[in-house]
């Protein structure tokens, strides 16, 4: 580490390389906060440096700092720091974790808590909102604020497109203002999946 510091002082042009190497060392040593302190100013001054963006993303990921990583997704995508298939997997991972970590603010009214869950869903790009895993996470967040009715139509559309047992199980937990629509959807699925154990439990 001392050699890296000396390199930065003696060879200013090598400073970026030395900082990247130092950040990698800090990450390996699990000194994540120090790595972030080192990387954030560099990312701010050199926003298009893909190596720095990847290191910062890795650090946030290892810290479980999903909120900071979510804010970094735009730059990771814009500067093509990660290949498209890995980028989509990372996005899904980040939003799934944000949803699973959702805790309504106890100081809020019930309506404010419902809005809090809705705002989290609005953070998710529209192109990802038909992902069954994310809808499961959204359902779980809405369940905490007694607002699962909001997601009924989205669940039906998603299950119609692709059968997803976890989503079907949650469909059975829906408390809805339109139970007849819920029953109609369930009966349609039953004709296509007459012996599906998850569906049979969901329909009671």
Language-model-derived ranges and their functions:
Residues 1-204:
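Repeat-based scaffolding regions
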